[in-house]
């Protein structure tokens, strides 16, 4: 593989010295970019875009042509894993993801296969390999998966949910069934992420979008336990260097210590978490990623720069910070404002690395 020209992101994940704070944005390849919308229209729909390695590569690279980002992230979707288990993923306009088949009982869970990532998810590996070749070592490539708990919520609910009543009904009435599902998903995610690493991903991230809807006790039992299982099962070295892993639980700021105990390299923070407090609590053990409110990108440029300075000052001097949004960028944000954010991170962070 080509030697990496900019390894700032990987170094920061391992709390090694960098010249400026690295930055990337969750959903940086997305609907806020007109060129993304044109490529998606060319593909026909979102799923077709994910399954076409050349077009998935194109949209992965689009934000890097506009902004001096320090990492690329694979263009895909967290729901590729349940789709590969036979649930039939599709998207309703204005409704988000849906499954043709939901998981409703113990027998459904027992029937679920553990997908072979080189077969049922081979299109993802093709995309990873295509992106790595096209990056030519400019920046590292991040692979990712959803967490078992988050994937299970979509599988049991049949799609997006506001109240999570169906999965919580299973959790409280038949916890053994839910544990069986979560264990199958953890095994599937280990295989999936390790295949991404073999295909060329240089870091991986686990998105636990819905862990924050649980109580602390239930979070440890039904979400964190299975992310820990994944971290333990991951290939942590490739191409002669460590492959860092980041955990991100939206709404998980109260559980940072327990998350750091998994042995991950970094924690993603949402915007409700104070980064100075997070560093005091776990900064000696893990790097921190985040954590500007994505809605701040609607603000005038001066306000965006002010917020970047506040976050950088909150983390303070030294290593182990990757600047990012606290969740995905909104589709109607002006691309110019995303550029202001990225440029401000690099320019304003210089004094923190002397």
From Swiss-Prot:
GO cellular component: cytosol
UniProt entry tagged with the keyword NADP: no
InterPro entries: UROD/MetE-like_sf, Uroporphyrinogen_deCO2ase_HemE, Uroporphyrinogen_deCOase
Site entry (Transition state stabilizer), positions: 77
EC annotation from Swiss-Prot or TrEMBL: 4.1.1.37
Positions annotated to bind substrate: 27-31, 77, 154, 209, 327
Pfam families per the UniProt record, alphabetical: URO-D
UniProt protein name: Uroporphyrinogen decarboxylase
Organism: Edwardsiella ictaluri (strain 93-146)
